[in-house]
């Protein structure tokens, strides 16, 4: 069988592969590319709008990104890093809108304030400390903090009506928040790529073999899931952006770099309300804090979503468990991913992360009434008949071999690449799609290191991402410029003013003490 030859093969038709394809189309327009997707179309797994929470993750509201150390100091480093990454995404999308790659911004990004919403003396004190700590960064300008029920009611009336007036509450509100439809971005990116004769999309195409050729390229065999016809493609560079399917494919390639990894699948479900009388009264993504005694997985949040042009409200997530690595995967995914090199790390994580096991067991035992009771903590006047339970996508958390501990559960995403850069894959879950542009930029820096260093690529990278190579957190004026530029092209509200005097007053955070390790799973 004669193999088709391409410069780049993208395995998986989600936001990651589509984003990398668009990056490469900008940087090397003559390169030939093929994309393989096992389902009937692109963006049908985790990138699909109904299969994720659609948060434009920029650490404005997610409390697990600002842990408290043993001395009571709030650590904002991770929050700043995640926000920096999201600013790269904003610039990347703004450039694509300018160039007609992405169409109407309202179809994929919508202004949705991000809030943290907590109750109880200890949690309110923590939230105020967090608010004060974030004043040291220009990236969090415009954030407001309040313990006044009347003010909080102006922000989120649904969350306040019917609430016990004696309950001690605290909330922060940021005008910089967004709701994202990553499925729409994916579809528009792939549509743009398809307009070029150097790009070929094959759907219903499942990879069955990945072998190294003598010349260093990769021979990938795939089967049409409708006809069973087998085809072969030779690629100089292979990117595995297959979500939960990426670990299997990396293992299939035989690259030793994959030996360090195992995966643990966790799903998430949400309660959904589509009644316009309710959905039009809530405009926020309001994140809570994990209850005492349970590890902060993805903490509960009550979210405005815009899906297919329609406003809906989601509440969750509730953890679910399946041995599948993909929503449309196989129940044998987990067991078939176990190898002699990753079995022990998985056992160690199971022992060390026992609170996770307890948490998942508790989540799986929840009844409809239990889930509704959790919702009422955030939306006291909710009516049970208006909500339905929806199973969202699967996430596969990274378990990585560790010399000291045997194995550790890793947060975030990791790029796993062969030493020669000829094949790379993306493992992990959070913050995921929000940071697809910077994550794929890190893939370019890892596997095309020499090209990234050329004046041609450097100039193009800075054209697409004007802040490339700089830390926005250290340059308030650049933050102001970037916000104004991206807000204009993404049709977002005028960004808040940055108070330079407040930044000076905040000063540097204390050195601090160790931060207690908390198990965390991204749903």
Curated annotation (Swiss-Prot):
Its EC number is 1.1.5.4. Pfam families: Mqo. Its cofactor is FAD. Signal peptide: none annotated. It comes from the Bacteria. It is an enzyme of class 1 (oxidoreductase). It catalyses: (S)-malate + a quinone = a quinol + oxaloacetate. Pathway: Carbohydrate metabolism; tricarboxylic acid cycle; oxaloacetate from (S)-malate (quinone route): step 1/1. One of its GO terms (biological process) is tricarboxylic acid cycle. GO terms for molecular function: 2-hydroxyglutarate dehydrogenase activity; L-malate dehydrogenase (quinone) activity. Keywords: FAD, Flavoprotein, Oxidoreductase, Tricarboxylic acid cycle. Belongs to the MQO family. PANTHER family: L-2-HYDROXYGLUTARATE DEHYDROGENASE, MITOCHONDRIAL (PTHR43104:SF2). This is Probable malate:quinone oxidoreductase.
């Amino acid at each position: 069988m004669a193999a088709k030859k391409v410069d780049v093969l993208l395995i998986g038709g989600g936001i990651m592969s589509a984003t990398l394809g668009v990056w490469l189309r900008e940087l090397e327009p003559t390169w030939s590319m093929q994309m393989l997707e096992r389902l009937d179309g692109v963006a049908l797994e985790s990138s699909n709008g109904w299969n994720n929470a659609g948060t434009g993750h920029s650490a404005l509201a997610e409390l697990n990104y600002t842990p408290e150390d043993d001395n009571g100091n709030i650590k904002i480093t991770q929050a700043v890093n995640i926000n920096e990454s999201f600013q790269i995404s904003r610039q990347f999308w703004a450039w694509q809108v300018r160039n007609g790659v992405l169409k109407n911004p309202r179809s994929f990004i919508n202004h949705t304030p991000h809030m943290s919403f907590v109750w109880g003396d200890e949690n309110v004190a923590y939230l105020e400390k967090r608010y004060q700590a974030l004043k040291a960064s220009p990236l969090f300008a415009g954030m407001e903090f309040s313990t006044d029920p009347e003010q909080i009611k102006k922000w989120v009336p649904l969350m306040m009506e019917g609430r016990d007036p004696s309950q001690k509450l605290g909330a922060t509100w940021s005008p910089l928040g967004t709701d994202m439809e990553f499925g729409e971005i994916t579809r528009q990116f792939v549509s743009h790529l398809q307009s070029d004769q150097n790009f070929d999309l094959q759907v219903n195409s499942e990879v069955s073999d990945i072998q190294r050729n003598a010349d260093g390229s990769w021979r990938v065999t795939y089967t049409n899931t409708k006809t069973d016809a087998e085809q072969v493609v030779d690629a100089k560079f292979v990117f595995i952006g297959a979500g939960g399917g990426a670990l299997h494919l990396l293992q299939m390639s035989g690259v030793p770099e994959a030996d360090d990894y195992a995966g643990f699948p966790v799903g998430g479900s949400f309660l959904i309300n589509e009644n316009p009388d309710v959905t039009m009264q809530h405009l926020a993504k309001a994140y809570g804090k994990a209850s005492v005694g349970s590890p902060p997985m993805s903490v509960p949040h009550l979210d405005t979503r815009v899906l297919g042009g329609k406003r809906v409200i989601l509440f969750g997530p509730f953890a679910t468990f399946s041995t599948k690595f993909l929503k449309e995967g196989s129940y044998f995914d987990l067991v078939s991913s176990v190898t002699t090199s990753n079995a022990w790390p998985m056992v160690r994580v199971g022992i060390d992360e026992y609170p996770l096991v307890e948490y998942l067991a508790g989540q799986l035992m929840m009844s409809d009434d239990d889930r509704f009771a959790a919702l009422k903590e955030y939306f006291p006047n909710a009516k049970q008949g208006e909500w339905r339970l929806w199973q969202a996508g699967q996430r596969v958390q990274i378990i990585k071999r560790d010399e000291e501990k045997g194995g550790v559960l890793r947060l975030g995403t990791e790029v796993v690449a062969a030493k020669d850069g000829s094949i790379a894959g993306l493992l992990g879950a959070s913050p995921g799609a929000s940071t697809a542009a910077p994550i794929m930029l890190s893939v370019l820096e890892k596997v095309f290191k020499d090209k990234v260093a050329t004046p041609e690529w450097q100039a193009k990278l800075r054209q697409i991402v004007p802040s490339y190579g700089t830390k926005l957190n250290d340059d308030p004026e650049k933050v102001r410029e970037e916000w104004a530029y991206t807000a204009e092209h993404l049709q977002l509200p005028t960004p808040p003013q940055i108070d330079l005097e407040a930044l000076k007053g905040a000063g540097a955070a204390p050195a601090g003490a160790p931060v207690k390790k908390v198990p965390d799973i991204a749903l």
